[in-house]
């Protein structure tokens, strides 16, 4: 018999909205934390201290565990590794080179290194999605929702985008603090252009969430500029590029030179302004 989830009160619904804005989690996962911890501060602390949300339905958990077991690495049975990830992608019809939904899964399912998945966060992450997903066909059917969320939800975009940086630099234990430029360009090209053309856009212009003013032409200038600089990409430049893209106007006039922007972005603004003066 299917379990019946009690509806959230108006107060709890507001707390769920606040929790999602802070953490970038799904509605289902946010609701689990709010129901368990009752107060926003306690729920957020638990989330960032990696305390688990309430367990999934036992039957769902068992089935998801069986999915994980199917792909785990025979030489390291505590992990799904690259070979298993490629098999998983094949079953889910994901092209890992061109489909950013794999990064959605990585962020939501707690992947700490590229192509690696521990069992507990893998199971809990899928269980946090709506619809009682307990099979690969159900997970595959949910992927279009994640793809749409990535290009339309600013908080989710930032969560997945920043997690991609951590993966690409080698995970949380890596001593590498920046990304090779070629890697960064590949990832920017994967994340930014699809969001430019979606309405609503994850890169909507602030403060009014109007259509983006930083679009493909400005993005192309950014790539051109970075290729000329030919430098590795720092975490600050990576993360703040999203805020910059959402705040800058089409003519690059409304830029706060005194703001706490990375020097790379300062230099880019001057680069674009010089180009515009020369037109």
From Swiss-Prot:
GO terms for cellular component: ubiquitin ligase complex. InterPro entries: DCN-prot, DCN1-like_PONY, PONY_dom. It comes from Cryptococcus neoformans var. neoformans serotype D (strain B-3501A) (Filobasidiella neoformans). This is Defective in cullin neddylation protein 1. Keywords: Ubl conjugation pathway. Residues 59-273 form the DCUN1 domain. Residues 12-48 form the UBA-like domain. May contribute to neddylation of cullin components of SCF-type E3 ubiquitin ligase complexes. Neddylation of cullins play an essential role in the regulation of SCF-type complexes activity.
């Amino acid at each position: 018999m299917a379990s019946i989830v009690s509806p959230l009160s108006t107060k709890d619904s507001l707390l769920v909205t606040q929790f999602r804005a802070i953490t970038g989690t799904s509605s289902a996962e946010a609701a689990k934390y709010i129901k368990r911890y009752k107060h926003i501060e306690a729920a957020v602390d638990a989330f960032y201290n990696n305390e688990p949300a309430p367990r999934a339905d036992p039957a769902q958990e068992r089935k998801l565990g069986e999915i994980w077991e199917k792909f785990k690495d025979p030489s390291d049975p505590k992990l799904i590794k690259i070979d298993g990830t490629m098999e998983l992608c094949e079953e889910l019809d994901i092209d890992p080179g061109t489909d950013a939904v794999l990064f959605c899964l990585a962020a939501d399912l707690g992947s700490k290194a590229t192509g690696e998945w521990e069992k507990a966060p893998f199971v809990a992450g899928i269980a946090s999605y709506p619809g009682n997903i307990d099979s690969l066909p159900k997970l595959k059917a949910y992927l279009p929702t994640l793809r749409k969320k990535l290009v339309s939800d600013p908080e989710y975009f930032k969560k997945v985008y920043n997690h991609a940086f951590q993966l690409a630099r080698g995970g949380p234990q890596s001593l590498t603090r920046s990304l090779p430029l070629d890697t960064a360009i590949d990832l920017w090209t994967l994340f930014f252009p699809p969001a430019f053309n979606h309405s609503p856009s994850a890169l909507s212009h602030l403060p009014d969430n109007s259509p983006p003013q930083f679009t493909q032409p400005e993005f192309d200038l950014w790539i051109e500029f970075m290729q000329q600089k030919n430098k590795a990409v720092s975490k600050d430049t990576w993360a703040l590029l999203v805020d910059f893209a959402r705040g800058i106007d089409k003519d690059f006039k409304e830029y706060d030179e005194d703001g706490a922007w990375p020097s790379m972005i300062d230099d880019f603004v001057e680069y674009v302004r010089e180009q515009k003066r020369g037109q």
